[in-house]
Amino acid sequence: MAAFSMEPMGAEPMALGSPTSPKPSAGAQFLPGFLLGDIPTPVTPQQRPSIGVMEMRSPLLSGGSPPQPVVPTHKDKSGAPPVRSIYDDIASPGLGSTPLNPRKTASFSVLHTPLSGVIPSSPECKNISGSRKRPASSVFSPATIGHSRKTTLSPAQMDPFYTQGDALTSDDQLDDTWVTVFGFPQASASYILLQFAQYGNIIKHVMSNNGNWMHIQYQSKLQARKALSKDGRIFGESIMIGVKPCIDKSVMEATEKVSTPTVSSVFTPPVKNIGTPTQSVGTPRAASMRPLAATYKTPASADYQVVADKQAPRKDESIVSKAMEYMFGW
């Protein structure tokens, strides 16, 4: 009776759980075949997607070979994925453990190779940074930049006529109040001088005898810079003027020799008004100022004197006035 009652109970769950599987043996009535290690039959259509999913996920998750029972079943099938090519990418030498690393390395080297100009031997950052520094130092070296600046700002290049710059050296100090105006005809020299007189006080100007330029000295460096900003301006709708810093040392030296005794004679005060004339040479403004103590002293030879008026009202100091002040508060 016990054996008779167990047969229908064992046959009913097998018929409901796996209808397509073959009839199980008597020893494995309550357990499915995949738990006991049985190889599934290739005829069942439900096992094909499960095998394909296991084969595609196994290289990415574990990185090892798939289970032995699965490999012989999908090699004979036409719908199985190319497992061999996936394993070749993982086991290739010099790359990472996952197939994503060779893609990153290749893109990294492709992106950085045009910048450096040299193909690095390994995808390390040190080699790429080193190869990047080499062309930068050769192209944009500080020595090259300094050399180009020096050539652009040299006095020979600033000279519009390229004749006076050869006599200058690097130790020469030029006067920044001098400018050279050029590009005008001889008939318009006075007109151009009048136009440049609007930018500052002109101390001296030297005209060229046969050329189309003149040297102008302003009172301050700020006025000279204002005149330099008019380089390339058109005057009279037909004359374009160029303005450059003056580098003609002969004009500056001649002006200094002439103006040196004149300046000393102008700023030398008379000896009669000041007791120490040596201090007034260095400070000409202090020589013309009066000492502060002189305002509080009235000299005997002054033109104006304060005379005390005898008829000025004064306070009465008599006894009666004092008594009235005490009593009435006056």
Swiss-Prot record:
Disordered as annotated region, ranges: 1-32, 61-82, 122-142
Residues annotated as domain RRM Nup35-type: 173-253
A GO CC annotation given for this chain: nuclear membrane
Keyword terms, alphabetized: mRNA transport, Nuclear pore complex, Nucleus, Protein transport, Translocation, Transport
Cellular location(s): Nucleus, Nuclear pore complex
Job description of the protein: Functions as a component of the nuclear pore complex (NPC). NPC components, collectively referred to as nucleoporins (NUPs), can play the role of both NPC structural components and of docking or interaction partners for transiently associated nuclear transport factors.
Family designation: Belongs to the Nup35 family.
UniProt KW Protein transport keyword: yes
Molecular-function annotations in GO: nucleic acid binding; structural constituent of nuclear pore
PANTHER family per record: NUCLEOPORIN NUP35
Name under which the protein is recorded: Nucleoporin NUP35
Gene for this chain: nup35
GO biological process: mRNA transport; protein transport
Gene source species: Xenopus tropicalis (Western clawed frog)
InterPro entries: Nucleoporin_NUP53, Nucleotide-bd_a/b_plait_sf, RBD_domain_sf, RRM_NUP35_dom
